[in-house]
Amino acid sequence: MDVFDGLPDPIIVDILNKVGDVKTLLRCSSLSKRFNSLVPQSESLTLRLDHSVSDSPVVTSIFRSLFNGLVSLLSKPAKPITITTLSPSLPFKILSRFDRIRNLDVELPGGDVKLEKGAAVKWKAEFGKTLKSCVIVAFRSAGTVSSPVAVEGESDAEFVTGLKTRVVWTISALMAASSRHYLMREVVKEHEEIESLVMRDKEREGTVVMNEEGLKELRNTEARVEDEERVVKNKRSVVPSVRMSMRHAPSLKLKSGICLESATLVIVRPSGADFEVGDDAELATEAFVGDCMYGEAVVALLKCKKNALEMNSF
């Protein structure tokens, strides 16, 4: 007798939840009739996807149309942004075998934001029917220093010099986040039992999260026809008009001995959202809690001068 034959179904399902990986579970379903009936009952899944990418020329028009008062600074054409073009039908079909999903983690093979060598962008976005918030930390290069010093603010000239790069980082992150949100729309609406959704790439560059409230909001909201047309055309969810709090340090020396050049913290919220002055710190620190270098950078950058920007929907 096989060792599994003596185990009750709930224990087998619990073991399958520990396995988690969707491809492995689908292989397990072919082992026997019993496994074929129990695998679809798995509640905690990890779906690893391959995807193709394409260059999006939309960034140039975004620069020219979304930022009031910055056209002269951003007149030089920007390089295309690389975004995910994976079809939403793929995860939908793969997960169609499962009918009790409660917690879903989705992993893409690589990040969406393409940067010059040495630069890094890390972001975390929360969604409901649309973007709720996004926190972005970026820097041009990282090195070590012999002794940490206090963080200083920046001059207006320093802010203007690096503004275009910081805007590129921000738009890249928002486009990547909205592409991932679009990717899972069909899955969220079909699997009403899902209570938690987390999407990240293997490099841990960007993370999209949806909690139970946000998932219900997406399922219960009917998009306007014109918005739906934009979504299908662009293969990503519409980014609403947003307000951004941007903080920047030309050289950020951390207590850990790491020095970040052109370090930037951007906190993005929808224009109509209500929030208190102190909410920036709470949102940013929670986004990178447990992430040593980025968490330390957030704390340091929150002490820098804040610059406010507004961006139209795109």
Swiss-Prot record:
Subcellular location: Nucleus
Reported induction: Not induced by auxin.
GO terms for biological process, alphabetical: cellular response to hypoxia; protein ubiquitination
Pathway entry: Protein modification; protein ubiquitination
Record-annotated F-box domain positions: 1-49
One GO CC term, this protein: nucleus
Keyword annotations of the record: Nucleus, Ubl conjugation pathway
Entries under Pfam families matching the protein: F-box (PF00646)
Domain of life, per lineage: Eukaryota
Function: Component of SCF(ASK-cullin-F-box) E3 ubiquitin ligase complexes, which may mediate the ubiquitination and subsequent proteasomal degradation of target proteins.
UniProt comment concerning the protein's domains: The F-box is necessary for the interaction with ASK proteins.
Subunit-structure text: Part of a SCF (ASK-cullin-F-box) protein ligase complex.
Protein name: F-box protein AUF2
